[in-house]
Amino acid sequence: MWLGVVTLFPEMFSSLKDQGIVSRAVNNGLIEFELYNPRDFAEDNYRRVDDYSYGGGPGMVMKFATLEKAVMKARADAPAEAKVLLMSPQGATLDHELINHLSAEHCQSFILVCGRYEGVDERFIEKCVDLEISIGNYVVSGGELPAMVFIDAMSRQLPGVLGNPDSSCSETYVCLLYTSDAADE
């Protein structure tokens, strides 16, 4: 699986790539990461990626052109046609059913866009985004944490990532778990 992550904070993904099952998947060549900082596609000397909301209101909005250029670069780098996913509190809730659906589509390339500030320019969503994804009915500071949740959940679906291939079929949220040592009580 190929992942292009558009983020203002690429360093946040180093721990995900360096530890746990995602690290194992990266080291075994099952997942490939590319990180794209929108600031690298900004056109001004200040590398500005946000602007005031047209019509006013609090907070800043991520600029259309900067995000579009980052996604276009990621699309060009992707080994196969990539599905563009925007991490957004308005999106479809990321749950086991959605993960299974996306993995069943056999899409092997995803571009994850991590929003910040008040959000992203709606023109970017309309033109570039295939699906908005939310990790729940609350707001976090940016799309990086939801993107990491998506990456971890999707990586569990890849053959060879988990130690036991049956682990992804019987996820632990469906039943109570106990260890075999009753003496611990």
Language-model segments: which ranges?
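N-terminal nucleotide/polyanion-binding subdomain common to many enzyme families
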Residues: M1-R75
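Conserved small/polar residues in nucleotide/adenosyl-binding loops
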Residues: Y178-A183
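Short, solvent-exposed amphipathic alpha-helical segments in soluble enzyme
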Residues: G20-R24, N100-A104, C128
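S-adenosyl-L-methionine/SAH cofactor-binding core of RNA-modifying enzymes
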Residues: K63-C114
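Thiamine diphosphate
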Residues: E171-L177
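A short acidic, often aromatic-flanked loop/helix-cap motif at beta-alpha or helix-coil junctions
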Residues: R39-D44, A92, V139-S141
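Structured adenosyl-cofactor binding patch, chiefly the S-adenosyl-L-methionine
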Residues: V120, F124-E171
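Hydrophobic/aromatic beta-strand patches that form the interior of the parallel beta-sheet core
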Residues: G4-V6, E34-Y36, L85, F110-I111, ...
